[in-house]
């Protein structure tokens, strides 16, 4: 048709590329994978638990942050720091929850991997900052390797929990099935089948291997 100018090739191409990238970005944020949902965080309880606007409690999969005693206003080392970092990441924001095989814990909390709008995983961010350690629990192990890599990054950098590390001495025994480690003197170790026993000379070695401290006999951090 006369009187109309065609856009030049490069200009049309640049505009098309920009629109294409914009659409891809919008798709990545709005598309919700199977087993995932968009939620808004109302309150942060501690370093690994939040309350959603709909009232549900969410416990982050694959990590364990230092405990906070809300009644006494006390906490394990780095407990308040973990809560502050968690709050800075998620409080009041709309995020994406990704579920695994087991969706609720024994307390009725939703078990989830939590993703920020930019795609970063909050579980992973807290490990990278040294404000939590890996807590591998079957069958929810989809990102086990990725989370362990994040913990090792923090350990190498001596970040957070790993900053002023000291070893009290002694030996430790891990359970291949539960991925927990115990003081060698703990009676619980007698229940571990020989084929499932893993010996560690230090707590550092146990954490580096992806084992978490058992609540029995408290090998701790």
Sequence positions of predicted segments:
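Small beta-barrel nucleic-acid-binding modules, primarily SNase/OB-fold domains
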Residues: 2-221
């Amino acid at each position: 048709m006369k009187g109309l100018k065609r856009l030049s090739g490069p200009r049309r191409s640049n505009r098309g590329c920009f629109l294409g990238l914009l659409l891809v970005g919008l798709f990545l944020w709005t598309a919700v994978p199977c087993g995932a949902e968009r939620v808004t965080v109302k309150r942060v309880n501690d370093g690994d638990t939040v309350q959603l606007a709909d009232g549900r409690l969410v416990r982050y999969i694959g990590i364990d942050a230092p405990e906070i005693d809300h009644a006494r206003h006390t906490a394990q080392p780095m407990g308040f720091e973990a809560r502050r970092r968690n709050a800075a990441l998620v409080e009041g924001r709309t995020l994406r929850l990704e579920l695994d095989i087991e969706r609720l814990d024994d307390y009725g909390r939703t078990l989830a991997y939590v993703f920020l709008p930019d795609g970063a995983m909050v579980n992973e961010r807290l490990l990278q900052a040294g404000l939590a350690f890996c807590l591998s629990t079957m069958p929810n192990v989809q990102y086990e390797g990725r989370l362990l890599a994040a913990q090792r990054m923090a350990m190498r950098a001596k970040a957070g929990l790993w900053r002023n590390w000291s070893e009290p001495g002694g030996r430790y025994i891990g359970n291949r099935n539960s991925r927990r480690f115990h003081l060698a003197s703990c009676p619980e170790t007698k229940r571990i089948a020989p084929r499932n026993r893993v010996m560690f000379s230090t707590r550092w070695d146990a954490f580096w291997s992806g084992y978490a401290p058992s609540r029995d006999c408290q090998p701790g951090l």
